[in-house]
């Protein structure tokens, strides 16, 4: 095993059972592996501030982005060039050509009803609470 990639609905979600419920799951895992391998963490980080805050916790050596990259395919460049104000946190269903999704994925995504997909402007979205 070269690394551990932990994908959570929320990066800073607290432990529910089997441990200190005041501690986050990511922090618990990081402490448990104790530097034996790098930890990659992900979990609904949509803005540059959220990404930086997650990294600065020290709970993960690397931060991964899932839904955020679907919405902003060039997010690394946007952050590097100081264009954080251009980062979108919701899909715009009127910009079909902007995202480059295959038709089936676009159909599922633009409906805004799947919490495992990015939020859509004008649609209620709430991450799953698991």
Region roles according to the model:
Residues 1-130:
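Flavin-dependent oxidoreductase catalytic cores
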């Amino acid at each position: 095993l070269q690394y551990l990639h932990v994908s959570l609905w929320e990066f800073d979600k607290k432990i529910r059972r089997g441990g200190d419920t005041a501690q986050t799951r990511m922090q618990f895992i990081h402490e448990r592996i104790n530097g034996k391998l790098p930890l990659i963490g992900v979990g609904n980080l949509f803005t540059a501030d959220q990404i930086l805050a997650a990294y600065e916790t020290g709970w993960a050596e690397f931060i991964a982005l899932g839904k955020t990259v679907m919405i902003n395919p060039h997010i690394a460049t946007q952050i590097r060039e100081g264009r954080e104000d251009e980062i979108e946190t919701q899909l715009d269903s009127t910009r079909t050509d902007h995202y480059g999704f295959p038709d089936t994925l676009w159909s599922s995504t633009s409906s805004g009803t799947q919490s495992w997909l990015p939020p859509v402007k004008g649609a209620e979205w709430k991450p799953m609470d698991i």
